Amino acid sequence: MKNNLKETLQTVASGLESAKVTNFPTNWESFNEVNEETFCNQLVDPWGRHGLSCLKNVKGTHARHKKINDMIQVAISVSGTPAETEPRGLDKEDGKQPDGWTLYPWTIGLLLMWDYTCRDTLAASNVLGCSKEAGSAAMAAEDIKRKKYSELAKENHFIPIAQETFGSWGPSGLELLKEIGTRTIIASGNKRARANLFQNISMAMIRGNIINVKSTLPPLNKNQELLFLNSIISPLFDTHYGLESK
């Protein structure tokens, strides 16, 4: 695992990963004795990575999904095109519903529809590909979304937005968020609007990671919990504010 992790860390930087502020903890040694089974009977090792992709441990996943979709919806609306999440009034004979859409045309007379997903960079099915090419899991997720919503895409401007737990973006979603950010700058006059959008989304992703990893740990006493939170949060703020050790 350590070799795969090192390879992944070396290649994970692509596009706007700097906007997410480096989020992987540097003090996991404090939890080297953690080696227990979770409620889904999977082994949790000191890296705590199982929680990032556990299908039963979804507290952080659901919270992250809602928060990021809300951020995207607000940014689109601020940019000048009203939008909403959980679209109503769609022809849903196939039971498929994207995460959000615009109420007015976004481009060439078409409504924008988007669907967000976050894939675990370190999942067994992703880590090898991600160690060779940054964002490979996100790119694959975008392709899956396109196939899923192919019917809606015939009459709408559908864009999949895929992100990874280490911060890499799928190319289509990345370009859409850049465009949203640019339109927001024009509409609001705030030159940092695009950077703020990426940073806010990335922090929401990080918080989801923390919740999911923490949910797989055995009960901690107060001192252990403070140490755990410090090991994650300190690197975030040190890197974000340029305080990392030289």
Question: Which residues make up each language-model segment?
Answer:
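Short Cys/His-based metal-binding microdomains
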Residues: 37-68
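Non-catalytic C-terminal interaction segments of nucleic acid-processing enzymes
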Residues: 1-43, 59-60, 74, 78, ...
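Conserved beta-strand/loop block within the catalytic cores
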Residues: 95-104
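Two-metal-ion RNase H-like nuclease active-site motif
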Residues: 86-88, 99
